[in-house]
Amino acid sequence: MKRVMLPLIMLLLSVQTFAQNSIEEQVKTLSNQKWQWMADKNVDSLNLLFDDKSMFVHMGGSWGKTQELNVIKGGGIHYKKAEVYSIIINIIGNTAILLNDIDLIAVVGGNEVINPFMVTEVYVNENGQWKMGSLTFSKLSRPVKIK
């Protein structure tokens, strides 16, 4: 009996680990795609990604989906490039929490700025589709790394 149980337990653990890694890769790819959509001001794709109840926290304030899309579309903030140095992904049930250490090159109020941020992204999987629930920019005290 022990001979049968141990391989079965090992198989179940490896399947669970594979599934977890697959989900993490899926969310990581989606996060990277989101940065590109933001740089391209692709509000149509972002509109599909952002949940209707999503919230966004920036250095200058916080707001919901409609205002975030309007800020991107109108150029209030142009996310030119996010240089991502590391991503930590935690999956809790149907929720993915990502911590991204980035340098962000953006145009804000007509001025190009570069800031180091820890960006927290929260995604929720509903009916097999990942939707962004929150995006928070926390400014880091470290120097900018991007050259």
Walk through the language-model features, giving the residues of each.
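A beta-strand edge to alpha-helix "cap/lid" segment located at domain peripheries
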Residues: 7, 20-48, 53-147
